[in-house]
Amino acid sequence: MAILRTSEIRTMTIEERADELENLNNELVRERALTSAGGAPENPGRIGEIRRTIARIKTIQHELNEI
């Protein structure tokens, strides 16, 4: 899953943003589970990227009063 830019997030519909947020949260849980199980992540910076993208989506949702 690609990391989204702010401009890409703003052009999404409300439903697309909600779906993307759910997908990213699920991916974050999987990455954290892999790490906590002792596995080495394929991309160590991926967890931070996912967290930042989630924050971007939530910020834009708040700005647009979608929450």
UniProtKB/Swiss-Prot annotation:
GO molecular function, one term: structural constituent of ribosome
Keyword Ribonucleoprotein attributed: yes
GO cellular component, one term: ribonucleoprotein complex
The organism's place on the tree of life at top rank: Archaea
One annotated GO biological process: translation
Keywords: Ribonucleoprotein, Ribosomal protein
Assigned protein family: Belongs to the universal ribosomal protein uL29 family.
Protein name, entry field: Large ribosomal subunit protein uL29
Protein's organism: Methanosarcina acetivorans (strain ATCC 35395 / DSM 2834 / JCM 12185 / C2A)
Lineage: Archaea, Methanobacteriati, Methanobacteriota, Stenosarchaea group, Methanomicrobia
